[in-house]
């Protein structure tokens, strides 16, 4: 995969947008693991970070981001601007991670 610039702003500082290619997105839906739920439940009782869920969310975010970048690369983009990350609960124990933005071609 080629290097694609990702920013949350609508433009890349010091670079001019030559062409806008459109919306790109990547998502993943993950379910919790029963065994990890037990450990997370115990940690919830005593306080502190719930590592099992933090790891699950980090992996989900990376997978969704990779999928968005693959879509941007297919369009010929060298940057994605206005990037956003959202999460939503799909059903009990499952959540969606969605990463989206606008694929663009920046002048070299």
Predicted regions and their residues:
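N-terminal presequence-like segments and the immediate start of the first folded domain
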Residues: 1-36, 75, 95-108
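Hydrophobic alpha-helical segments and their boundary regions
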Residues: 3, 15, 36-37, 53, ...
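Short alpha-helix boundary/capping motifs
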Residues: 52, 70, 81, 92-93, ...
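Short, well-ordered alpha-helical segments
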Residues: 24, 29, 37-84
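Hydrophobic alpha-helical segments
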Residues: 39-41, 90, 98
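Short, solvent-exposed loop/turn elements at beta->coil junctions and helix N-caps
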Residues: 9-12, 85-90
């Amino acid at each position: 995969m080629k290097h694609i610039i990702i920013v949350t702003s609508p433009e890349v500082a010091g670079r001019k947008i030559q062409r806008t290619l459109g919306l790109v997105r990547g998502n993943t839906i993950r379910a919790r693991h029963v065994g990890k739920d037990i450990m997370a439940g115990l940690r919830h009782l005593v306080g502190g970070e719930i590592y099992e869920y933090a790891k699950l969310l980090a992996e989900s975010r990376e997978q969704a981001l990779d999928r968005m970048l693959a879509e941007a690369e297919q369009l010929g983009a060298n940057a994605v601007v206005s990037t956003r990350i959202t999460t939503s609960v799909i059903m009990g124990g499952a959540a969606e991670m969605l990463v989206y933005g606008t694929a663009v071609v920046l002048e070299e």
